[in-house]
Amino acid sequence: GEFVLFGPGLAQDIMAYKLALYAAVKPEVVVLGSSRAGNVRAAFFERPFVNMAGAATDLESLRLLVDRMLAVHRPRVVLLGLDFWWLTAGAPAGRPERIVQPSLLDASTLRAPWRWLVQGRIAPADMLAPLQHRLRADRYGLEAQLRDTGYGPDGSLYEGAVLDGRRPAPDHAFARTLRELESGSGVWAGSLAPDRERLEAFAEICCRLRSRGIRTIVFLPPLATPVLGALADRNGGDAGWLSALRQGLLDCGVESMDFSDPRVYGSGDCEMMDGLHGGDVIGASLVRDMGDRQPWLRDMLHREYLSHVLRERRGLAAVPDERLTALPEADFLGLHCAKKRRGEATPRF
């Protein structure tokens, strides 16, 4: 089918978009989680697939998403990417009852283009694009039009203009993530110790899935190695905080796979998109590793494609896809990564 991207500049209701996609496809395999789980592609699987990542941003929105999904269709498999800060005391809890469709006519929305202009998100020439018929029919929203950034036909996340260097990486050398971590704001508020009440709330969501006969794999998405180091420093030099989190989950009856350190499975910082998001080569690594551990999942994977990706694209963030960009991958994070093309991976969508 046609390759389109949905990448709104405004705070649109991603959950509604993903649920509409889910209802249309009725997938056997589903990915849940924040945008950090958005790097898992339909091409990795031999079964109908939808990536719902980005529709949930905390435990409460995850619970709401699962309720709405199960009211429509029951998948066979859920791969659930867990952001560890969803389970720590002091992090934002979320208020699902406030999840409403944003108005396109309120004052904040009408001022948004001028705010983006001041912030440098758009250039003066971009303001004229609609009048000059320069908008692309296969790109929906500001991020998709200007940055080739958004969710693709399978629901997975693409970041084209950052990948090829047309736009600067917002988290160059992971500086933004490290700065936010040091300030202790937002998701970095509070301690790294897991909160028992939140652990139990997450376990209840997993139990809901499994009680419907849905095989569920909980996994911790990757972090850049400097971010892992900064988190260990924040914990008094002790890197065991992740083990404590996984043990807390286990005590509540939830097993998990820890992919937080890319070095453990042969990846690295050059395969990251920023401090918190791995590229789709890392996504391929995670899925193949899951299949190696769970034979029932292995039979659903396109193993030949995964092997090709991991053989040809190690050390790079993305599989070439000319529908997104025809330009080669750049050293967009400024890490002195060798970004030479080593062969094209055959697209399979």
Which residue ranges define each predicted feature?
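Short extracytoplasmic
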Residues: 2-31
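Short alpha-helical segments and helix-capping/turn motifs at coil-helix boundaries
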Residues: 12-18, 61-68, 201-202
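Membrane-embedded segments
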Residues: 26-117
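Second-shell loop/turn segments in exported
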Residues: 51-56, 188-195, 232-235, 272-273
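Soluble non-cytosolic domains of exported or imported proteins
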Residues: 56-60, 73, 168, 192-199, ...
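Secreted/periplasmic serine-hydrolase-like ester/acetyl group-modifying domain
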Residues: 95-212, 303-349
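Extended hydrophobic/aromatic segments used for targeting, binding, or gating
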Residues: 200, 204-273
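C-terminal regions of proteins
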Residues: 243-349
